[in-house]
Amino acid sequence: MNHSDTIVAQATPPGRGGVGILRVSGSKAAEVAQLLLGKLPKPRYADYLPFRDADGSTLDQGIALWFPGPNSFTGEDVLEFQGHGGPVILDLLLKRILSLPGLRIANPGEFSERAFLNDKLDLAQAEAIADLIDASSEQAARSAVNSLQGVFSTRVNHLVEALTHLRIYVEAAIDFPDEEIDFLSDGKIEAQLHQVIHNLAEVRSEARQGSLLREGMKVVIAGRPNAGKSSLLNALAGREAAIVTDIAGTTRDVLREHIHIDGMPLHIIDTAGLREASDEVERIGIERAWHEIEQADHVLFMVDGTTTEATNPAEIWPDFIARLPESLPVTVVRNKADITGETRGVEEVNGHSLIRLSARTGEGIENLRDHLKSSMGFSGNMEGGFLARRRHLQALELAATHLEQGKHQLLAAWAGELLAEELRLAQQALSEITGEFSSDDLLGRIFSSFCIGK
């Protein structure tokens, strides 16, 4: 990719609309303005002008905006044509611009990439642009704006600065071992390291919430046939998404519903009843059910309350619980409380959450909704929250691992050189979030997922 080229792309969605925008960025943007507008508009003022073809005829007329670099989104000279949103008109205008030498169609995300490369925004902020466009809820959109304004980046940069300060002390202890003050053993480095680890844990917790807000929580409903799994899916979805009958094994395949609970996206997955398969189709359905369970963020273990009084999942179905990943959160849902007369509500039983409800009548469903929010650490008040991606979580986790290893080197061996290296690696992992340290491959993967005009 040649970043010295002047690029152009449509910045509005394809199709018919009231307004269509073409964006130009690069050194030849001023030349484009002279040839199509007949003049260079006043910087940052809206000029109503005809857009001219090569023969002088008018292709369209509309608003022209001129942003000379470096005071523009990309940091380069930027020109925008805001005309009528007909696809034919926009195509003619685009062809006219591309007929000029040195111009080409922008690659996906190239405008944002140039803004990043020209230090107009960091990598986390650039990703927030795409997240804001793709936001599926009001809370996700607000958190994306926070990320775009630098809330997440500021938290990360504070951690990086703290590590820089800590590394200065450690490097001094290594370089000047004969000094009267032993920086490694006087407790100051240990105290600072503990504080950085604590602050990083807080950022990781907020980032996990931001990731859930962006990507959604995968909740799998599992259990024996006829426990009420499909009825629960319908109750949570608020519509008849799944067929419900008294015939065991009605659900043969995986059913998915995407819902929001107070702005938090959930992917609710209904699975085939787990039992010895009676035919090949059911066997495949059960295999798929286990695949979904093993990939879940949370499992709702549906139990027909009329068949057992047990509340401990290990007593209800020990083989099922034994097969689950140890770290997977499981909530036991005792269904048919309208028949058994059980009190609706949530309680803790032997390390598992237990909810009594009726999927058929809807009693207790709100308790389940509230439980799903709280079990994932989600708070309805996330004014200062930010969105995070999986790569951000991985970088934060890697940084935490290096800090814990550095702590071990400090406390167990007083190994200053090894501690310094772990601090450097932690700092490098954090710097990947904002793009201060990043590979070309990483940048390519991130910006290739953007819209063309961004």
Curated annotation (Swiss-Prot):
Superkingdom classification of source: Bacteria
InterPro entries xrefs: G_TrmE, GTP-bd, GTP-bd_TrmE_N, GTPase_MnmE, MnmE_dom2, MnmE_helical, P-loop_NTPase, Small_GTP-bd
Q: Which GO terms describe its biological process?
A: tRNA methylation; tRNA wobble uridine modification
What GO MF terms are annotated?
A: GTP binding; GTPase activity; metal ion binding
Annotated Mg(2+) binding lies at S230, T251
Cofactor detail note: Binds 1 potassium ion per subunit.
Domain TrmE-type G per the UniProt entry, residue ranges = 216-377
SUPFAM superfamilies, sorted? P-loop containing nucleoside triphosphate hydrolases, TrmE connector domain
Q: Kindly list the positions annotated as binding GTP.
A: 226-231, 245-251, 270-273, 335-338, 358-360
Q: Does the keyword Hydrolase apply?
A: yes
Q: Name the CDD domains for this protein.
A: trmE, TrmE_N
Enzyme Commission no:
3.6.-.-
Positions of (6S)-5-formyl-5,6,7,8-tetrahydrofolate binding: R23, E80, K120, K454
Q: Where in the cell is it found?
A: Cytoplasm
The record's listing under Pfam families reads: MMR_HSR1, MnmE_helical, TrmE_N
Q: Which GO terms describe its cellular component?
A: cytosol
Which keywords has UniProt assigned to this entry? Cytoplasm, GTP-binding, Hydrolase, Magnesium, Metal-binding, Nucleotide-binding, Potassium, tRNA processing
Necessary cofactors: K(+)
Residues at which K(+) binds: N226, T245, I247, T250
Q: Which NCBIfam families match?
A: mnmE_trmE_thdF (TIGR00450), PRK05291.1-3 (NF003661), small_GTP (TIGR00231)
Q: What does this protein do?
A: Exhibits a very high intrinsic GTPase hydrolysis rate. Involved in the addition of a carboxymethylaminomethyl (cmnm) group at the wobble position (U34) of certain tRNAs, forming tRNA-cmnm(5)s(2)U34.
Q: How does it assemble?
A: Homodimer. Heterotetramer of two MnmE and two MnmG subunits.
State the family it belongs to: Belongs to the TRAFAC class TrmE-Era-EngA-EngB-Septin-like GTPase superfamily. TrmE GTPase family.
Q: What is this protein called?
A: tRNA modification GTPase MnmE
Please tell me the species this chain comes from: Erwinia tasmaniensis (strain DSM 17950 / CFBP 7177 / CIP 109463 / NCPPB 4357 / Et1/99)
